[in-house]
Amino acid sequence: MKGRDRKVIVRGDAGRIVCERCELADGPVSRARGLLGRSGLAPGEGLLLRPAFSVHTFFMRFAIDIVFLDRSGEVVAVAEAVRPWRAATRFRARAVLELAAGEAARLKLRPGERLEPEAVAG
């Protein structure tokens, strides 16, 4: 099962929940579709794209926080409140977590923290 059919919870240091309702986009179609067509993300919602080192907000209707992760899940960069019609790239990244704008600051996500996705049954 791939794409939006798969749900994950993303945990940070000390097991704290960073994204409670996160969709996994790990196929070419689900990664290309991303958050297109949505009106927004609520706190606790997100999209984990992998593999990915670059994302764009073209055709989107809302700003997002973008968390870039390396191969081991360590945060390498955070781009906050990226508005529509922008692009963000971090060549060291191997995955990207998209969150509602303001969530990265609220959660105090910083480079060096390790994030770990866990599969959710059902």
Residue ranges of model-derived segments:
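Compact, glycine-rich, soluble single-domain proteins
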Residues: M1-G122
